[in-house]
Regions:
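Helical "substrate-binding/catalytic lid" subdomain
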Residues: 48-171
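Rossmann-fold dinucleotide-binding core
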Residues: 1-58
Length: 175
């Protein structure tokens, strides 16, 4: 079963588990799955949990790009990056993703939590699903292009939050 979360959410006991398949099997397995994470959700037939996992991941990447835009707009106007990150990570947009990955724009982790390759794989799957299901995914498509740019800049082994660096370079800030 796919999970949503990170090393931190696992340590905090807040991992979310999505399960697809037969309902009877889910009902029997749920107590064991709750040892992995407290939020265990039956989502439907086989494969449906994977669809939701991809939906979660595309939302993470799109949020990271939007957060990056906000930080860089503030920074280019003269507000320090640190102040922008502090305000945004404690504002109405402060989702768990923003709270955990927002500080990455100040210092990337030594080891990627979810690297560019892994995120781009899910973005491409989402875009293909969108085409198949006639669901336009415009922000997913744009965010995917930033992941492609990260690959071109040699940042592929970095956490996908490195899309901030891509946008920063395009904005005349950074390396």
């Amino acid at each position: 079963s796919p999970v949503s979360g990170s090393v931190i959410t696992l340590q905090e006991g807040r991992l979310s588990v999505m399960v697809g398949g037969r309902r009877e099997t889910f009902d029997r397995a749920k107590p064991v799955l709750q040892d992995v994470g407290p939020k265990v959700t039956y989502v439907g037939d086989n494969g449906q949990a994977l669809v939701l996992k991809i939906a979660v991941n595309l939302s993470l990447a799109v949020q990271m790009l939007a957060f990056s835009e906000g930080v860089l707009l503030a920074e280019k106007s003269g507000i320090s990056r640190e102040t922008a990150v502090d305000v945004l990570t404690h504002s109405a947009i402060a989702s768990p993703m923003v709270q955990y990955r927002g500080p990455f724009v100040l210092k990337m982790p030594d080891e990627a939590w979810f690297d560019v390759n892994m995120m781009q794989k899910d973005m491409l799957l989402a875009l293909e699903m969108g085409r198949h299901l006639d669901v336009p995914l415009p922000t997913t498509a744009v965010t995917n292009e930033f992941l492609t740019a990260a690959r071109g800049m040699g940042l592929v082994k970095q956490d996908f939050a490195v899309i901030f660096e891509v946008l920063a370079r395009m904005s005349g800030i950074g390396k």
